[in-house]
Amino acid sequence: MSAVAKLAWKSLINRKATAILTIMTVAISVILLLGVERIRTQAKDSFANTISGTDLIIGGRSGQVNLLLYSVFRIGNATNNIDWKSYQEFANHRAVDWAIPISLGDSHKGFRVMGTNHSYFEHYKFGSKQSLTFSEGLEFNGLFETVLGSDVAKQLGYHVGSEIIIAHGISDVGFSRHDNLPFKVVGILAPTGTPVDKTVHVSLEAIEAIHVGWESGARLGPTPKAQDLKNRDFQPKQITAMLVGLKSRIQTFALQRQINTYPKEPLSAIMPGIALHELWGMMSVAEQALMAVSGFVVIAGLLGMLSSLLTSLQERRREMAILRAMGARPRHVFSLLISEASLLTAVGIVTGLAGLYAILAIVQPIIQQHYGIHLTLSLLSPYEWMLLGFVQCAGIVIGVIPAFRAYRQSLSDGMTIRI
């Protein structure tokens, strides 16, 4: 460390209170700037990694974003259902390689229940075309068996062999529960960092079975016992949506057009990638607003540092004069003020980074639980390094203003007593 840098460091230590406040101002600015950027990018990554390898999502006539949100992210509700015969027709279409039926509408203690079949565990992909795997047990086979997402099992303390009660609708209240039809947990999926972790999976037949006597949307009378229902043969009447994989992506647009003009019922077919792009387009204004607010906070922090340096410079006129009297040249005084600004900014950045990672470690499980966004404590990205470099350079530039004022002061200025 050079003599000027050592002197700058000792000068800041001598003015601890002011220096700490300035450092905290810069640190808060850095936390907000990088926090917004990290949440923005990782939210995108989390959404994009939720589903892969699916060529089309089919649901009742609806907008692209709405269909994507309720079928993949379990956000919102479907406008219409798909008739089971329509599902069978498209599942057996010559262009279709596989199809996954999805039936939504029930819940368990705040977690969505999804009816599906074996195709879901075989063909559903997330991330870089990763398949679902089990951390415990296996997929359901019996009527009243269920497979839990990792978050459901972890947060509610379930394990293979536990029994759960499903509630009708998304509000888990006493009068809406299927109390006499408990489901046995037979499998728990490995964590995926997607809405799969927050889902209770049952068979399509189970969805039909638990709604016997609930055809009007409410319990009309005594419901059959579980054993009586097991002896019946259930077939779905409707599903909420279906995920489709094609034999060749060349056929995507042709099949999409065929579904969108399907004469038997109003349906919509969307491509997940295009729907996600539309979703980001809708969110771009909010993203830009957040980044603008973060930028203004950084500017405010740097202006606070400028104010602190200018105020301290007025109080340090005698100190500067003594340095000049001891042989320091104007350029040395200039370098001293620049070094102080640089050190304040650098320490503020380091403090901000430490604070950011501490906050992320605390809020990570909370955001994962409530919003399904997986925040990672990863190393800084090149763009984040660039933002920090900008803050550091801006701090040095800010330091030029008091440094130039000190540079212009003569020896007699500091020795003159001002009243």
Regions found by a protein language model. Give the residues of each.
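Hydrophobic, regular-secondary-structure patches
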Residues: 35-122, 139-142, 231, 259, ...
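Short helix-loop junctions at transmembrane helix boundaries
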Residues: 350-390, 400-413
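Juxtamembrane alpha-helical signal-transduction segment immediately C-terminal to a transmembrane helix
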Residues: 39, 43, 47, 282, ...
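N-terminal Sec/SRP start-transfer signal
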Residues: 1-34, 45, 267, 329, ...
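Transmembrane alpha-helical interface segments in multi-pass membrane proteins
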Residues: 295-303, 310-312, 317-364, 386, ...
